[in-house]
C-alpha cells in the first residue's frame, strides 16, 4: 500500500495510490470534511483515546458545565543559576545561585485531557511528553496514536 501523508499542525490527511489513481482517505467521518483528521487527542481517566472531531465532542460532553476542583501539589525546589553582575573595574562576579519553590495546580475533577497542539512540540527538542492522570506519554506515543489511526483507516478503505 502506497500512502501519502500530510501531517499538518492543525489537520492531517492521507491519500492512497493504487497504481492508477490517487484517492483521499476518509479519516474522520464525523468531521465536516471527513478526509481531514483534526489534530486533537482526548485521553480520559480510563486512558481511552479519541481523536479528531470525536476528541472535541468527548471534551465538550464531559467537561462543559462541570464543577472544577483545584488541587495544589508542592514539588521539589529547583536551583536557579544566573550570571553575576559585571562591575566596572572589578571584573565579573560569581554566578548567583538561588532556590525557587515549585508547585503544580491540577483540576482533580477533570474527566480527561484534550491535547490540541502536540505537533507544535515536535520542533522543541527539550519537550519529551506529558503526564495524564499519572501516566507519562512520550511525544512519540502521542504522535503514534494519530499515525496508527491514519494507517488503519487507509487499510480499511
Region locations from a protein language model:
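Gly/Thr-rich phosphate-binding beta-strand-loop-beta motif of the actin/hexokinase/Hsp70
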Residues: 1-24
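Phosphate-binding loop and its immediate beta->loop->alpha context
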Residues: 27-157
Amino acid at each position: 500500500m502506497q500512502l501519502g501523508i500530510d501531517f499538518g499542525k492543525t489537520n492531517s490527511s492521507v491519500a492512497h495510490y493504487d497504481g492508477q489513481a490517487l484517492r483521499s482517505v476518509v479519516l474522520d467521518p464525523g468531521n465536516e470534511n471527513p478526509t481531514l483528521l483534526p489534530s486533537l487527542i482526548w485521553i480520559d481517566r480510563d486512558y481511552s483515546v479519541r481523536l479528531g472531531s470525536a476528541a472535541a465532542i468527548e471534551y465538550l460532553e464531559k467537561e462543559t458545565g462541570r464543577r472544577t476542583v483545584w488541587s495544589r501539589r508542592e514539588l521539589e525546589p529547583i536551583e536557579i543559576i544566573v550570571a553575576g553582575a559585571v562591575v566596572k573595574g572589578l571584573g565579573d562576579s560569581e554566578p548567583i545561585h538561588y532556590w525557587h519553590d515549585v508547585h503544580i495546580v491540577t483540576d482533580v475533577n477533570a474527566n480527561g485531557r484534550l491535547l490540541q497542539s502536540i505537533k507544535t512540540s515536535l520542533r522543541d527538542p527539550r519537550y519529551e511528553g506529558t503526564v495524564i492522570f499519572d501516566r507519562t506519554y512520550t511525544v512519540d506515543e502521542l504522535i503514534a496514536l494519530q499515525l496508527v489511526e491514519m494507517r488503519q483507516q487507509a487499510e480499511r478503505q
